[in-house]
Amino acid sequence: VTSRTVTLLDVARAAGVSKSTVSDALQGSGRVAEATRDRVRAVAEELGYRPNSAARRLRRASTGAVGLHLPATATRLDYYMNLAFGAVERAQEDGLDMVLLAPSGAAGGRIASRVDGLLVIDPEAGDSAVPGLLDAGVPVVTGERYLGPSAGPSAAVVCDNAASLTALLDHVTERGARRPAVLAPSGSSAWATALRATARSWGLAHGVEVALRTVPFAATPAEAEETTRALLTADPAVDAVICAPDGSAPGVLRAATALGREVGTTGGGGGTDGSNGTGGGTPGTPPEPGTVARSGPGLLVAACVDGPATRGAAPPVTAVDLRPAAYGRACAELLCDILADRTAPDTVRRHAWSLETRASTGSPG
């Protein structure tokens, strides 16, 4: 059996039942005793049986495709591109094509006839397309939970986003920060909501007032730079900035450089009179036109999303590696498992992240 493709008949013979019983047991249909169903599934797994995708689609009037819905701002973010590649690769292993859905509110009402299932990534409560997708009548897996009103998704793959920001805040504190700031994303996605809530709860738990600023979900480096300049000018005691949106950390570095802040340390490097090392004045104020900012009070910089922008920055930026390709693959795998009756339609799986410490927080690169 192991030298060729395992067939339904092979499973039936090994389990001592008919082909129709095997088919019903694996599809969750028909009148099959639970003990028999469990035995058939165990035998199928032991033999390495995989259903024929084409035959299964014919039996179920399947389209052979699944849909992928990304946030409207996703097209310019490296994170979502890698996530999509991972999802496509995994879907193809089950003989399924991946269809990228337009970010349109009208898509959900017609989608059930076009795809067998849906991946809805970082669903926003304010996204008009999401409710229709979640209620389209096909299995749905969300990448992070949907927090808006709906009948609810079929399943989800989630990250512990509260834990990842907690790890960043703990890290910069261990490196000497006493007044951290968080540039958290706006919006009502589970990721954005968790980061804002965690910044507040961490501050309360540690007796520290975290300077929380809200930036767009997909803030550009220029937007991050503007927000950081305003923050450090108004509150020069801030000695660590954690930037959430993908790819925006270089803007924080530019703001720090412009204001004479030495990235990678919390120690002062400026004048002994408490200036920012730019020739006098209030700490955190920009240098006079025509002058060059010298190394002033330190600033630790970190990011909630790792990627080329953080790894290639000068200095490289400490960041949370969310492993987007693996995450996309995990979402697609859960949907494939649901479509093939390998798992329950309300399954929730967790996805692991890692903290990559680099020179921007005084850590070896």
Indicate residue ranges for each PLM-predicted region.
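N-terminal helix-turn-helix DNA-binding module of bacterial transcription factors
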Residues: 1-64, 365
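Alpha-helical recognition/docking segments in bacterial nutrient-uptake
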Residues: 2-3, 65-170
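Short beta-strand segments enriched in small/hydrophobic residues
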Residues: 21-23, 58-74, 171, 179-186
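Glycine-rich phosphate-binding loop signature in dinucleotide/nucleotide-binding domains
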Residues: 47, 172-176, 231-237
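Hinge/beta->alpha junction and helix N-cap segments in small-molecule ligand-binding domains
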Residues: 71-79, 102-107, 157-167, 182-227, ...
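Short, well-structured alpha-helical segments in soluble
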Residues: 105-115, 224-236
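Flexible loop/turn connectors
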Residues: 236-237, 246-365
